[in-house]
């Protein structure tokens, strides 16, 4: 789950991480009132969307007068902000964050992610803050350092100091001591909130060697949200794909993609293999959709409705391996779904495993124009051919 920058900064404040003062605004008038409350002489007007690269897209701008705040707020609210993370369609700006201006000095990058390979937390840092870290990795990989932290031991002061020195934070004891303190607070924040990503870009060091987090990006582990109702309250459904939100209500794992072949599969691994096979034979998947091991006829019907809600879908591939899941249950769901949505696009079904033969019999006797396939490769080839 993602949250907005201003919400992330609320969390950082709770953990004692220094951030500029700021106030969220949903209207132009609220933006003006926020600037007046904060006081001048400079404000930063920030569009709030769940995507990076806002500055390059015109979503982060300085204002030196209240009239400028009003003008910028009026132009940003409602705009389709396009960044390298939004795609060509952009994302609509519905919220702003009005923040006090900062004395910009040297900018650094800090982030924490979980590294599955080492089974540790990776503390990633760079002296090239304020830039896209992927761009830094490509152009100046030597400017990025990674320190692995054992979650059983935690981030000790010696590791934090090693990171601070490694990215060239200024030598005065005050600055390095503050850097160590901030990193340890960020680590505690990451652990206590069950985050899967915590990114500060940039961490600003001003002319007096004071450090401030000028941006905050969080992702949270969806499997741990049940114990964080305060974080769930931050969720902004308007920033999410409506199809993905609807799918979550039926316990379906759904992610939209850019192709034209809908995929309904049980199991994340099989779903990814299915999409790869479609690509191998020249097709393009329109979605990732895992119905899980406890799918019912109702869930299958809802899955079909969600897939067909995408106008780009020109065909559907159902690929089921019946272990816990019974193939006849899926077949019943597929038949019900076809009738419920009045299916008008090609449908290929491949089923193997538990109750495979009864499932195939149900499909064959349904009277529906379902294309049967025996292997995953056969299924992929058939659906790719059908949508051409």
From Swiss-Prot:
Cofactor note: Binds 1 Mg(2+) ion per subunit.
GO molecular function: ATP binding; magnesium ion binding; succinate-CoA ligase (ADP-forming) activity; succinate-CoA ligase (GDP-forming) activity
Cofactor: Mg(2+)
Binding site for substrate: 266, 323-325
UniProt keywords, alphabetically: ATP-binding, Ligase, Magnesium, Metal-binding, Nucleotide-binding, Tricarboxylic acid cycle
Domain ATP-grasp: 9-246
Its EC number(s): 6.2.1.5
Residues binding Mg(2+): 201, 215
Enzymatic class: ligase
PROSITE patterns named among the record's database cross-references: ATP_GRASP, SUCCINYL_COA_LIG_3
Subunit structure: Heterotetramer of two alpha and two beta subunits.
Role, per record: Succinyl-CoA synthetase functions in the citric acid cycle (TCA), coupling the hydrolysis of succinyl-CoA to the synthesis of either ATP or GTP and thus represents the only step of substrate-level phosphorylation in the TCA. The beta subunit provides nucleotide specificity of the enzyme and binds the substrate succinate, while the binding sites for coenzyme A and phosphate are found in the alpha subunit.
Database matches in HAMAP family: Succ_CoA_beta
Family recorded in the similarity comment: Belongs to the succinate/malate CoA ligase beta subunit family.
Name recorded for this polypeptide: Succinate--CoA ligase [ADP-forming] subunit beta
Source organism: Verminephrobacter eiseniae (strain EF01-2)
Lineage: Bacteria, Pseudomonadati, Pseudomonadota, Betaproteobacteria, Burkholderiales
Gene it is expressed from: sucC
């Amino acid at each position: 789950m993602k949250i907005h920058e201003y919400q992330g900064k609320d969390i950082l404040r709770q953990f004692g991480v220094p951030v500029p003062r700021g106030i969220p605004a949903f209207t132009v008038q609220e933006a003006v009132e926020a600037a007046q409350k904060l006081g001048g002489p400079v404000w930063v007007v920030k569009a709030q969307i769940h995507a990076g690269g806002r500055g390059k897209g015109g979503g982060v701008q300085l204002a030196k007068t209240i009239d400028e705040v009003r003008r910028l707020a009026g132009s940003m609210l409602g705009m389709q902000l396009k960044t390298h993370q939004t795609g060509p369609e952009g994302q609509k700006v519905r919220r702003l964050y009005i923040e006090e201006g900062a004395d910009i000095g040297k900018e650094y990058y800090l982030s924490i992610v979980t590294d599955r390979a080492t089974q540790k937390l990776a503390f990633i840092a760079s002296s090239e803050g304020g830039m896209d870290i992927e761009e830094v990795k490509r152009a100046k990989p030597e400017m990025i350092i990674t320190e692995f932290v054992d979650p059983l031991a935690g981030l000790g002061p010696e590791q934090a100091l090693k990171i601070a020195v490694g990215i060239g934070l200024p030598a005065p004891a005050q600055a390095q001591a503050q850097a160590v303190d901030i990193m340890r607070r960020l680590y505690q924040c990451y652990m206590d909130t069950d985050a899967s990503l915590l990114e500060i870009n940039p961490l600003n060091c001003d002319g007096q060697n004071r450090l401030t987090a000028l941006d905050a990006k969080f992702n949270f582990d969806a499997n741990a949200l049940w114990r964080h109702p305060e974080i769930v309250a931050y969720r902004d459904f308007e920033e999410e794909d409506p199809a993905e939100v609807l799918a979550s209500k039926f316990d379906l794992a759904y992610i939209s993609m850019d192709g034209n072949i809908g995929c309904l599969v049980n199991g994340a691994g099989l779903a990814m293999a299915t999409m790869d096979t479609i690509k191998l034979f020249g097709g393009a998947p329109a979605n990732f959709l895992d119905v899980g091991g406890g799918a019912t006829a109702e869930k299958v019907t809802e899955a079909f409705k969600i897939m067909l809600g995408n106008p780009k879908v020109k065909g559907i591939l159902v690929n089921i391996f019946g272990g816990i899941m019974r193939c006849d249950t899926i077949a019943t769901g597929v038949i019900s779904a076809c009738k419920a949505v009045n299916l008008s696009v090609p449908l290929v079904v491949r089923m193997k495993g538990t109750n495979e033969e009864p499932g195939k019999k149900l499909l064959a006797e349904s009277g529906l124009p379902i294309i049967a396939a025996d292997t995953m490769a056969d299924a992929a080839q058939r659906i790719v051919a059908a949508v051409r």
